[in-house]
Every structure is written in C-alpha cells, then in structure tokens.
Amino acid sequence: SRPFVVRMITDSLRWWCEAIGIDGFRFDLASALARRRGEIDGVSALIVAIVSDPVLRERKLIAEPWDVQGYALGAFPYPWREWNDQYRDVVRKFWLHGYTLKSGDMATRVSGSHDIFFYRGPNSSINFLTAHDGFTLADLTMYSEKHNEANAEGNRDGTNNNHSWNLGVEGPTDNQNILEQRLRLHKSLMASLVMSAGVPMLLMGDELGRTQAGSNNAYSLNPELNWDATENFGGGWALSWDKRENDLSDSIAALSSIRAKYLSEIIDEFFTGSIDQGTKRKDIAWFHRDGLEMGANSWQDNSLRYLAFMLDATHKQSLFVILNGDK
C-alpha cells in the first residue's frame, strides 16, 4: 500500500502494455493485493490505482482471489474478473458421482454465479474446471486420489479435495466400457463449461487428453527429469500431438461454435426467468426430465442429477440444453 510500491507496480504493468503489447494480466494470489490493514476489501491502494489507470483499466485484469491468509471471491471491483473456484467444485460434483449437491447450486453456477457477481455481471466470473494447479481433465476421471509420489514429499503435498472419480479403476485401463464412460464425462464437463454464462477458461492440453498420471501438484516436480521419464508422466509436460484425443477436440470445437452462434450476444447479463414482451418467452426456463418446468421446491433436491434449460437465444431460435449427470 506504500505509494512508491504502488507506483512501481503500475508503471511496470503499463510498460508491458505500451512497450510490449500485453493485453492482460492474471494476478496470482491476488487477494494479497486487495488486503488493507489485514482485511480484504477490494479498495486497497494498489487495486484502486490499477482500475483508475486509463491504460490498465482497458486491459484484461484477472484475479486468483485467494492466498494463504484469506479468500476473496467476489471482492474485486469492475473491471476485474476472478477465477471462480466455486464453479469448478460444483460442476465437478454434479458430473462425478459420490458428492452431495443441491440442484440449485448447479443452476446458479451455469447461469453466471449471480450470488457472487450480482453487481458486476456474469462476465466477471472466470469459469474453469482445471488449471495449472490440480488434476487435468483426463485425470479427473482416472484418479480418485492424488499421486504426487514423484515430488519426494511422501504424497503430502497437493490438495486432497479433488472432487474426482476414477469410475472403478485407479489410473489407466484397457476396459473399453470405462474408457467410453470417461470420454463421455470429459465431453459433458466441457459442455457445461462452454454453455455456462461467464468466461470459460480451458487448461491447455485438456482438449488433447493430456494426463499427469494423477499428480495434482506438477509445480513441485524436478524440472531436470528426462522428458520420457515415468516420473514426468512419460512426457506429459509436453502436449502429445501424436496421441491427441481427436474426438474430444472436435467436440469442444463444435461446442465453441454453438456458444459463438447462440450465446455470445445474450450472456452479458444475468438470466432472470423474466418474460420477453417481444417473444413472450422467458430468457431462461428450467425443466425436469418429464418436461415440466421446475418449481421453487425443486432447487433443494440433493439427489437431482438432471437439469434441462431453454435459453431464448434469438427472436427466432431458442437453445435447449440437457445436463444428465445420472447416466
């Protein structure tokens, strides 16, 4: 918060923008920047200086809104965007069995997390399922437990709260039925991400089926390991273009096209369920598997793993999305 430190940081950021052409920044452990007198309030001297700067405020500003001392999701001012770990955890729990979850929680995250970003809009939420920390998408359905033995810390490092599901076999398998289920879950997770209101973030390599062999703390691996070493996931740090999962990659491309065609112009604001006087349709409507619209009591159901919603995408077309976590 000291003026000369704030000036040094903002001058450095502005130099990267003006001299190099950087169009945005992601701030690691950003809640440390928002802390004032020991409390996180989003109006620290540095945060105010960044959002007040005519150059920096026009760049993409993305916060990881937590650090070792605190959690600050939703505390950053416009135009900051924030990594939404609540989105990550809820969507994982919906698709990967064995976790308690109210159906309303999934609907809230898919429709933009209005409970967190009500005053700023859904585009303030960076929706993600995987990141550089934690499991890859492939490992979410291959491992129920972390495997960080190669880090030489007795597998104590890395979180134990992965919300993952191995479908009965820990690690790789030749069982074709399990392989098909895993691929279907990968597609379902990606469909939820791409079809949600908010800004979707994909971990590079997930679209290719990249694995870390169950490691959820790759940062601590020895960087001098041979690329082909077993401890280095058989080259998992690099993208295996020759072993890529074309089916998954093609599916993500198709989903992205659907988002661009139907959703790009209607997800800047939260869906409310209100009726458009021009189309006489709700901007979003939620349905049970029997086709009946969901009522208020439905949102407290802990066992419901099926959600369907219709978006009033255009005056001529609507988009109907089914999320079936039961099968």
What does each of the following model-derived ranges do?
Residues 10-36:
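Active-site groove signature of glycoside hydrolases
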Residues 3-6, 14, 236, 240-259:
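A short, structured beta-strand-centered segment in the mid-to-C-terminal lobe
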Residues 244-292:
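Catalytic cores of secreted or luminal carbohydrate-active enzymes
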Residues 219-239:
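Acyl/amide activation-and-transfer machinery of modular secondary-metabolite enzymes
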Residues 286-327:
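Carbohydrate-binding surface patches
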Residues 29, 65, 323-325:
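Residues immediately flanking
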Residues 21, 36, 42-204, 208, ...:
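Conserved alpha/beta catalytic core and glycan-binding cleft of carbohydrate-active enzymes
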Residues 2-18, 185-190:
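Short, acidic/polar
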